[in-house]
Every structure is written in C-alpha cells, then in structure tokens.
Amino acid sequence: MTQKTIVMTGAAGGVGTLLRPRLAGRYNLVLSDRGPAPDDLRPTERWVTADLTDPASLAPLMAGADGLIHLGGYSIEADWDTVAAPNIIGLQNIMAAARDAGTERVIFASSNHAVGFYPRTRRIGTDEAVRPDSFYGVSKAFGEALCSFYADKFAMRCMSIRIGNIAERPADKRRLAIWQHPDDLAQLITIGLEHPDIHHAIVYGASHNERAWWDNGAALALGYRPEHSAEDHVDHAMAEQAKLGPNAVGDLFQGGTFCAADFSGDVTRSLNARLPRP
Ligand code: 15L
C-alpha cells in the first residue's frame, strides 16, 4: 500500500523535531516552516518553506496531501497581534488550503492553555467549557472551534490535541500532571490520521500520568494506549521544581505561569466558578 502524504507545519520547532523520526517510517512527510530546509532530511521527508500568513505559499504546500499535522503558529503567550496573525488568520489560511487541496485529515496542535484556568483540584474531560489562560490559549480554543466547523461544514476529519508538555521527561511538578512523551504523541497523531470514525475529536495530549487533571476517556475510546508514565521521572521533576519559587496564582491553576502573567483577577471567584457546559 502506498504511504500517505502528510504535511507537518512548524516542523523546525521542538515538537516537530521530536516527532519527525517517529513518523518518518510510516508516512511520506512534507515538512514545512518559515525557514530554509534543514540538512538532515530523511528519504521519506521533503521540505517546503511556507508562511501561514501568506496564503499563496500554502497552496503548493498542501497539494497532494492526505493529511495535515498543524504544529505551526505562535507557541507561547504574546501580545494579541503577535498571536493572532499566525494562530487565527494563519490557521484559517492553512485550513482553507487543506480544504482546497482535498486533504481530509487534520491534526490540530491545541494546548492545555485552552483550559488553563481550571483549578488544579478539578478533573476535567473534553466536554467542559474552554477556560483559556492567555491570548495564546484563546487562539487554541478558536482553533478547536475552527476544526469543528470544517468537520461539520466540509466533512473534514479533525483531531484537536490539547497538548500538555512534550519532552523526554517532565520538567517540574506541574508537568507531572500534563506531560506527554513524544512516542505517545506520535501514537495519538497516528490515531487521528487513521481512525475511521473521527469527525472532530478533542483529546488531551498526555501520557499515563498518575497526577493527571484530565479525564482522557475520549482518546482511550479511540484506542490510545500511552506507554509512558510521568511518575517514572518524579525525582527529576521534583528536583527541578525545588529550583522554582512558589507562584501565588500559577500554583492554583492548571495553566500555571500562563495564568499568573498580567493577572489582576479574583482568585477566589475563578477557583469557585462553575461554568455552564457548552
Ligand atoms: C504550551 O502550549 C506551549 O506551547 C509550551 O511552550 C509549554 O509552555 C506548554 O504549553 C506547557 O504548558 O508546559
């Protein structure tokens, strides 16, 4: 059987770099970012330089693609214009290019920051209202809505993965709850690209974490079986945590320092709020 052709945006970034060796044997990868091609392309990888804010560069990128893994865009908090150009306008540009190219599958790299203002004492699934903790988180909530729209309106099949933190091991105490090993993310992406019954799935990008704040039943129902556990790295994570000072706001909410930045809210009200289900 011929291998599927899958476009990966943001391929030069940290997550893309960790995913490439894990997906290159399974798909023909069309890697893309704003800069020039790296010098380590594998035989099943090719490179297309493109910019999410330049629609003319996206049509040639998406031509012939069976699927899109969209990691591109701004990946941390910034002022609204900086986030919105790639993550709002740019996201619609790449979705439109995918639709025009007849690409059926989209994996959208959403983020835990779409729900970052849930207290750490709450266990949440994917059927609760979004609670973004930053302009960045708002852009990820928008992205989930856009994927839902493309699935309903144009019959595309999308998976929004609310990624926790992708690394070889969890970096601190917060990451013990939200960490995902790159092997497990690659497994989840493969499910999103291949499972026959996906319309728009929202799942958490997390490994098997004892301290998880999330009910990842939606991913498990699709066959996701994470092989890594944050608790195996607890000594490392806690040693790193000890180097960080306490954060009066960030330590209460799932989004951590993203919640604390520029915070002038009411902690008690946010902790106790019960939002209506969407
Ligand atoms: C994210 O969504 C960011 O892209 C990444 O840089 C980390 O900050 C991660 O969340 C996290 O919450 O650890």
Model-derived features with residue positions:
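Alpha-helical substrate-binding/gating segment
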Residues: 163-169, 179-201, 208
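Conserved C-terminal active-site "lid" loop/helix of NAD(P)H-dependent oxidoreductases
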Residues: 208-225, 240-268, 272-273
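NAD(P)H-binding glycine-rich loop region in Rossmannoid oxidoreductase-like domains
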Residues: 45, 49-86
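Catalytic helix-loop patch of NAD(P)-dependent Rossmann-fold dehydrogenases
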Residues: 85, 119-155
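Conserved Rossmann-fold NAD(P)-dependent oxidoreductase catalytic core, especially the SDR/UDP-sugar
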Residues: 93-131
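Glycine-rich NAD(P)-binding loop of the Rossmann-fold in SDR/ketoreductase-type enzymes
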Residues: 53, 82-93, 101, 112, ...
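Conserved glycine-rich Rossmann-like NAD(P)H-binding loop of the short-chain dehydrogenase/reductase
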Residues: 27-38
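N-terminal Rossmann NAD(P)H-binding glycine-rich loop of SDR-like oxidoreductase domains
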Residues: 4-25
